Regions:
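Alpha/beta-hydrolase fold catalytic core
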Residues: 1-18, 39-41, 77, 81-82
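Short hydrophobic segments within beta-strands
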Residues: 19-23, 87
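Serine-hydrolase catalytic-loop signature spanning alpha/beta hydrolases and amidase-signature enzymes
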Residues: 22-32, 43
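Gly/Ser/Thr-rich beta-alpha loop segments that engage phosphate groups in nucleotides
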Residues: 24-27, 52-54, 90
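A short acidic, amphipathic alpha-helical/loop segment
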Residues: 32-33, 98
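Active-site loop/oxyanion-hole signature of alpha/beta-hydrolase fold enzymes
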Residues: 35, 44-87
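Aromatic pocket-lining residues of Rossmann-like dinucleotide-binding sites
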Residues: 37, 99-100
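Gly/Ala-rich beta-loop-alpha elbow adjacent to hydrolase catalytic centers
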Residues: 88-92, 96
């Protein structure tokens, strides 16, 4: 399972906003955005496999867009996030597009 952080807004009715970083980055790149968006959304920040606190050797599969996309979906399912807005940069935006497909 990927490492991730959740910041839940006190208002349970607000939407989720999920942040996906690019290759070579990790969830800490979003620190400035967290300050603003946590006022209006529940936030989910994910470290992709092999990045940040998500250790790559914990995953048996080859690193493909499909496998990494499935990693993200597993986190969404674990947190019971049925709908989310997404913010991504570089590789993160490619993965978001794969999720949308």
């Amino acid at each position: 399972m990927l490492h991730y952080l959740c910041f839940k807004n006190p208002n349970k009715d607000v939407s989720w906003l999920t942040f996906i970083h690019g290759a070579g980055g990790n969830s800490s790149i979003w620190s400035q955005q967290i300050r603003f968006f946590k006022q209006f959304y529940h936030l989910l920040l994910i470290d992709l496999r092999g990045h940040g606190k998500s250790i790559s050797h914990e995953f048996d599969e080859v690193y493909t867009f499909e496998n990494v996309t499935e990693d993200i979906i597993q986190v969404l399912d674990k947190e019971v996030i049925k709908k989310s807005h997404f913010v991504g940069i570089s590789l993160g935006s490619i993965l978001i597009r794969k999720i949308a497909d």
